[in-house]
Structures are given as C-alpha cells and as structure tokens.
C-alpha cells in the first residue's frame, strides 16, 4: 500500500484492548498481532505501547472470573521481552514464505459502504473484502493489497502477476484509475473481476452516471477501457498481452458459506499458473526470518491441520521463562517467535540476547561482561545472556547470584526485580 510512495510506516500492536475481555485473551491476541507486524520485512519502526499507564496500572479481568487485577507478572515479563526485541529488528529484502505476485485491489471508498442492509442487499462483516483475500491467505498465499489510489505510480504493479478486484464493496473515485489498470493488463497482467454489480451503491450519483456518462456500474467503464463489452459474462478474455477473467458472483458469497470459495480459488490458481508457468504453493503456515529472529504462524481453517515443527537451537520469545529448545511445534491457530542461536554462536563473545529490561552501559572485557538493566517497577526481568563459557561469578547489584547455565546454547538465564533506576550486573568467567 505504501511502497510506491516511499512512505515510512509505523506498526502499532497493543498488549491490551479497549473491549472488556480478560488478560489471557489479551495475551493471545497480542502474540497474533505482534507476529503479524513482523511478517512485513520492509517495516522496522513501531509504536510499542500506547498509554503505558493504561497497561501497567489498569485493572482487567482474570480469565474465568469476575475479579480484576493489574497486569500479571508473567505477562509483563513476556511483553517486555517482545518489545525489547524490536530494538534489533531491521528491514530486510527477505520475503514471507509462499507464492508471491497475487494481489487484491482496495480503495479508500471501502470505508464508505458500511450500510448493513439496504433494499435486500447486505455485505455482513466486510465479507466481500474477506471473500477475495481469505481463500488465498488461509491456503498460505501471502496476498498483497494494492491500493487503487496508487495506480498512477509505476511501482504499484511491480512483481504483480494476478490482480483480483470487485466493485461490490467499493467504487472508483476517479475514472482515470481504469486507464492505469487497463494499461497494466494490456502489457501482460491478469485481472480477475468478481462481482454482480447489483449493490445499491452502484447507482449513487457519481462520475460514471453523470456529466454525460451513462454507465449503470463503474465496471462497465473499466471493461470498455479494456476493449470488452460493457457487461461481459463469466469467462476469460484477452486484452493486448494480458487477460481479463470475469466471475459474475459477489465475493461475499465465497466466505459466507463453507466450501463456496473452491471455484474462486481454482480460478486464481489457474490464472497464476497460466501466467507464470509456476505452481502455487499451498500450505497452512507463514514464516519469515529477520536476522536471528524466526517468526511463524500456523492457520486454522486451512489446507491442513498439521502443526509446524521447527528444528534447531532456539530461545522461545513467547515464553516468559525463555527456554532453550531444539524443536518448536506450532499448532494451527498459534504463532511462534524464536531467537535462532545458531546465527550468533561463535560470532559474539558476550551479549544479552533477549530480556525484559533495556540494556545500557555494556562493557565486554577479556574475562568479564557487565551492563545496566532498566525497566519499570513491579515487573520481573528474565533474560538470556550469551557467554563464551560458564561463569564463575555473577553479581546483581553487588550480590552474588547462581543463575541457571545452559551449556548447549552457552547462555545464562538471569532473573531479578526490575528497577527504572538501573540494576547493575557483572559477570566473570
């Protein structure tokens, strides 16, 4: 959506929500949205915590009860670990796993068609948009969103092979957008139009039926721009070097009833494979690597109910105890956020790899490592520290500690009470 304009984007994920739910529900949704934002490698700027006092001091329900409490220690630790990792996240040219090159057209006017029911026509819960996207997404295809208002910019169509669109849930605010779409098809693109063009918004007074125009629907103008009749039926048509596929069904029907998306999905598969000569990869998960971080999500309602199993040497960043794992299983409906230790072992002498506090004043000596850890009061720091060997001495604010050592990962598991003024940690080996 923003790539053609070279705009800087900030992602926001919230550890709690405005709706009245419980802490467990907030945690589950936070993990999902946090993983989702990391699956866009072109973005590395984030708003991490809107209204911190609302998060740390607000009272919210305990799961399964009517009692309310402030944020649980376990959740604040996990949340702070997750947020701290964002300091290391950088943009990358790596792509999320799956078949790329399939997009769905959207426009600002999506926001205008929210009337729930009019003259017997409805589009419940944004179904026409989800009807175009979810049948692809749920089969592991990282469908792209293409903004109609960006079509005048040449980079908008970069890498795009198949573009799906419908005017059942949005309308073009300018006729000129059709010229850019038609030009893209003429040069070799494949456009899939889904829609019956019977919703009430087709008849609002707009450019396609005023000022000398007499189109019954804006799609008539688009089809005419591509050398077709104003109202072509179901079928496949050629225009220049490209292809136009017409499906006379509103995309809401693809998702309002189970199994109704089959014809639509088969149409997209055929269009993509005919255009590229490549097979579409169908799967139930997405995964991307960003530096030492591996982000994965396994979907429910997908092509398979199998879990995703990752083998290696990882720290589980969605677990407050930061366990070291050799196998991570992610079930349908779940996400995983892992630190890949194999990407740092032997490359870094000493470093706090992850933790629930911000690290300052790091000093690495021949046989020592020290730092200051800062984080909010009434929260617990848990961190994993990479060292060349098992330490002989660990001091936390001058007090000797005996934290857990993991030989396989060469990491020390530290835990102590956080302090915004700073906690001094000194390690010798």
Predicted regions and their residues:
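Hydrophobic targeting/anchoring helices
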Residues: 1-129, 232-233, 245-249, 254-258, ...
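A short, well-structured beta->alpha microelement
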Residues: 133-156
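Short, well-ordered secondary-structure micro-motifs within conserved domains or adaptor modules
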Residues: 157-170
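A conserved amphipathic helix/loop scaffold
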Residues: 171-368, 372, 383-384
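Solvent-exposed beta-strand/loop surfaces of large extracellular or lumenal domains
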Residues: 311-329, 395-414
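Surface-exposed interaction regions enriched in Ser/Thr/Asp/Glu
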Residues: 415-429
